[in-house]
UniProtKB/Swiss-Prot annotation:
Pathway: Amino-acid biosynthesis; L-histidine biosynthesis; L-histidine from 5-phospho-alpha-D-ribose 1-diphosphate: step 1/9. Gene3D superfamilies: Periplasmic binding protein-like II. Lacks the C-terminal regulatory region which is replaced by HisZ. Its EC number is 2.4.2.17. PANTHER family: ATP PHOSPHORIBOSYLTRANSFERASE, ATP PHOSPHORIBOSYLTRANSFERASE ATP-PRTASE. This is ATP phosphoribosyltransferase. InterPro entries: ATP_PRibTrfase_cat (IPR013820), ATP_PRibTrfase_CS (IPR018198), ATP_PRibTrfase_HisG (IPR001348), ATP_PRibTrfase_HisG_short (IPR024893). The keyword Cell wall biogenesis/degradation does not apply. Keywords: Amino-acid biosynthesis, ATP-binding, Cytoplasm, Glycosyltransferase, Histidine biosynthesis, Nucleotide-binding, Transferase.
Length: 213
C-alpha cells in the first residue's frame, strides 16, 4: 500500500489538526513529539505527515506533494490554488474584515486616500475592486496591520479578527465583514480520483467526528 501524504499548517492549527486525526484513529505520536524530522509517519495506516508554513500548504496540495492538507480559509482565499476544498472543519474560527476608525462607518465608498493596508493583498483587492467596484492602492504589511490607520499609512485595513479586542484597544471598528474564516480540509485533484479508496474513508470519518461535536 502506498503512503498518503498529509500537509499540516504550522502554528495555531497544528494541535487542533492532530487532535482531529487522532479522534479518527490515525496515530500522530511522532507529530506530538518534538522531533527535528521533517516527515513523520503513521506506519500502521501508511500515512506521512509534514508541517509547513500555512501559506505553503495549498501549494504542496495543488502540485501533489501532499494528497491532503489542513489550512485556514483565509490562506485559500489569498493563494487561489487549484484544489478541492472538501470540508469546513469549524475550528480556528474568525472573520476577515475591513476595519478602520469609527467615523468611516457606512462611508467605505468615500475614502480619501484610497489606501488599504493588509497581509492579504489579493483578498483586499478582490473585495474593493470587484465587489465594491472601487479602485484602491493596497499596501502589503507583514506585522501589526492595526498600526497603519493610526500613523496615517492607510485609512482602513483588511485583516483577521477573532474577538475584536485588538481593534477596540486601538480605536478601530469593523466596517464590513468579507468572509467567515475557519480551518478547511483540502485535497489534491488528481489524488481525489486516483486514491479515492484511501481518501474518501478519511473524509467520511472526519465528517462523522465533526457531527458529534
Amino acid at each position: 500500500m502506498r503512503y498518503l501524504t498529509i500537509a499540516l499548517s504550522k502554528g495555531r492549527l497544528t494541535d487542533m489538526s492532530v487532535e482531529l486525526f487522532e479522534a479518527i484513529g490515525i496515530d500522530c505520536t511522532e507529530l506530538k513529539n518534538s522531533s527535528r524530522k521533517l516527515i513523520l509517519t503513521d506506519e500502521k495506516n501508511k500515512i506521512k505527515f509534514f508541517l509547513a508554513k500555512p501559506s505553503d500548504v495549498p501549494t504542496y496540495v495543488e502540485y501533489g506533494a501532499a494528497d491532503i492538507g489542513i489550512v485556514g480559509k483565509d490562506t485559500l482565499m489569498e493563494e487561489g490554488r487549484h484544489l478541492y476544498e472538501v470540508l469546513n472543519l469549524g475550528f480556528a474560527a474568525c472573520k476577515m474584515v475591513v476595519a478602520g476608525p469609527a467615523e468611516l462607518m457606512g462611508k467605505l465608498d468615500r475614502l480619501t486616500n484610497k489606501r488599504v493596508a493588509t497581509k492579504y493583498p489579493r483578498i483586499a483587492r478582490e473585495y474593493f475592486e470587484h465587489k465594491r467596484k472601487e479602485s484602491i492602492e493596497v499596501i502589503k504589511l507583514n506585522g501589526s496591520v492595526e498600526l497603519a490607520p493610526l500613523v496615517g499609512l492607510s485609512e482602513v485595513i483588511v485583516d483577521l479578527v477573532e474577538s475584536g479586542r485588538t481593534l477596540k484597544e486601538n480605536g478601530l471598528v469593523v466596517l464590513d465583514t468579507i468572509a467567515d474564516i475557519s480551518a478547511r480540509l483540502v485535497v489534491n485533484r488528481v489524488s481525489m480520483k486516483m486514491k479515492s479508496e484511501r481518501i474518501n474513508p478519511i473524509i467520511d470519518a472526519i465528517r462523522k467526528e465533526l457531527e458529534k461535536r
